């Protein structure tokens, strides 16, 4: 009995040890496999990405918590400031303003906006250049050309006009409201403070920007104009329009109006200059003498001398002007040219009118002579036909009388 028990107990222990050995072997193999799989390159890359993802999630959580604390602090300061009557701005808002006005923040913001804009344009361009079938298609027009086409369409022009109008309106309202709030008058103010926009325009960078804009705009406009008018002669078109018979009356009216206005302006300006300058100088000198000498007789002389100056202002001014040799030469040249052109115009007009009169008289004489000759020919023809008719009738009457009274027959007479 004891042997049977010991045998059964040994068999049970051996089976139990065998299970443990099998379990340990399986555990070792699985652990080794897990170790190998864990240290594979692909698994290592995925593991690093997963760790980075977890790190990013943790950083975002920390950022959210920190920003929540910051927002709560800023909102609390703003709430306290709005509820209080103090004029001092909280320190949190001052620090935020310092951050927003710092060079690092503006540079970072400009770089981020630049990168976002470039990425958006590249993505839009790549998407537009690839068709639905995945084959790249050649785009004839660029993004800028398509944007300009959209802007210059009917809907685009309406949208742009609304946007520009609202922007200008809000800009003007904000400018004047800021002036009113700061206590600066818009016009006629006695304050010596220079407006902010004047200071901005007077800045070196703003002047460089304006100069670059004007240069670009001018060069572009001139280039486009030269390209468009390369094969066009502007002066030929102007003279063709002026010499067109359809525009003769309009051109005459325009030239007459321009010449009349120019002459009127020259005469009026020269008269005002010659009279006012000389009269003012003489009157000022005489008034100085009046103040020194004190008398009513002097004032009377002033009025008389003023009248004399006004009456003799033209002659004195012309004499003074002609005293200069260059002015005299110029005056003689202009006078000679005007006289020559006037004489030429008068002679041409007289010749044209004389030629027209000769033509009319010749035509009248020719018509009169032709009418009289035709009437004479008609009269002579009528009279000659009557005479011939009478002669023939008389001749036939005589012949018939002779034949009737003679005893010889008609055949014997002929």
UniProtKB/Swiss-Prot annotation:
Keyword Lipoprotein assigned to the entry: answer is no
The transmembrane residues are 20-40, 379-399
Q: Which spans of this chain does the record mark as coiled coil?
A: none
GO molecular function terms listed in the Swiss-Prot or TrEMBL record:
carbohydrate binding
Q: What superkingdom heads the lineage?
A: Eukaryota
- Respond yes or no to whether keyword Transmembrane helix is given for this record: yes
UniProt-annotated location(s): Membrane
Q: What is its main location?
A: membrane
Q: Kindly give the membrane topology term recorded for this protein.
A: Multi-pass membrane protein
GO-annotated cellular components: membrane
Q: Which InterPro entries match?
A: DUF2045
Which keywords fit this entry according to its UniProt record? Membrane, Transmembrane, Transmembrane helix
The identity of this protein, by name, is: Protein PHLOEM PROTEIN 2-LIKE A10
Species whose genome carries this gene:
Arabidopsis thaliana
């Amino acid at each position: 009995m004891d042997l049977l028990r010991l045998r059964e107990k040994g068999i049970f222990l051996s089976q139990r040890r065998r299970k443990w050995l099998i379990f340990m072997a399986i555990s070792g193999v699985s652990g080794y496999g897990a170790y190998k799989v864990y240290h594979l390159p692909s698994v290592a890359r995925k593991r690093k990405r997963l760790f980075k993802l977890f790190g990013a999630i943790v950083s975002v959580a920390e950022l959210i918590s920190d920003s929540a604390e910051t927002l709560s602090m800023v909102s609390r300061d703003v709430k306290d400031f709005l509820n209080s009557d103090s004029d001092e701005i909280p320190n949190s808002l001052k620090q935020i303003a310092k951050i927003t006005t710092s060079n690092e923040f503006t540079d970072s913001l400009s770089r981020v906006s630049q990168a976002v804009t470039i990425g958006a344009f590249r993505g839009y361009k790549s998407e537009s250049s690839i068709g639905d079938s995945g084959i790249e298609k050649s785009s004839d027009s660029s993004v800028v050309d398509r944007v300009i086409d959209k802007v210059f369409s009917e809907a685009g022009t309406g949208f742009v006009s609304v946007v520009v109008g609202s922007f200008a309106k809000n800009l003007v309202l904000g400018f004047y409201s800021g002036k009113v709030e700061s206590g600066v008058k818009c016009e006629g103010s006695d304050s010596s403070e220079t407006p902010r926009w004047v200071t901005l325009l007077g800045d070196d960078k703003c002047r460089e920007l304006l100069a670059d804009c004007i240069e670009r705009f001018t060069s572009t406009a001139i280039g486009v104009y030269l390209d468009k008018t390369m094969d066009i002669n502007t002066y030929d078109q102007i003279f063709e329009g002026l010499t067109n018979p359809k525009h003769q009356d309009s051109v005459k009216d325009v030239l007459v109006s321009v010449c009349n206005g120019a002459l009127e302006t020259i005469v009026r300006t020269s008269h005002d200059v010659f009279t006012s300058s000389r009269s003012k100088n003489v009157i000022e000198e005489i008034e100085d003498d009046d103040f020194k000498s004190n008398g009513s007789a002097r004032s009377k002389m002033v009025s008389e001398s003023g009248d004399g100056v006004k009456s003799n202002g033209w002659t004195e001014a012309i004499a003074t002007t002609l005293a200069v040799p260059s002015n005299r030469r110029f005056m003689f040249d202009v006078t000679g040219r005007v006289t020559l052109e006037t004489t030429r115009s008068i002679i041409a007009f007289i010749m044209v009118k004389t030629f027209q009169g000769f033509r009319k008289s010749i035509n009248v004489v020719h018509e009169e002579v032709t009418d009289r000759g035709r009437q004479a020919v008609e009269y002579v023809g009528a009279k000659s036909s009557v005479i011939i008719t009478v002669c023939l009738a008389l001749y036939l009457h005589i012949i018939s009388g002779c034949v009737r009274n003679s005893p010889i027959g008609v055949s014997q007479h002929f």
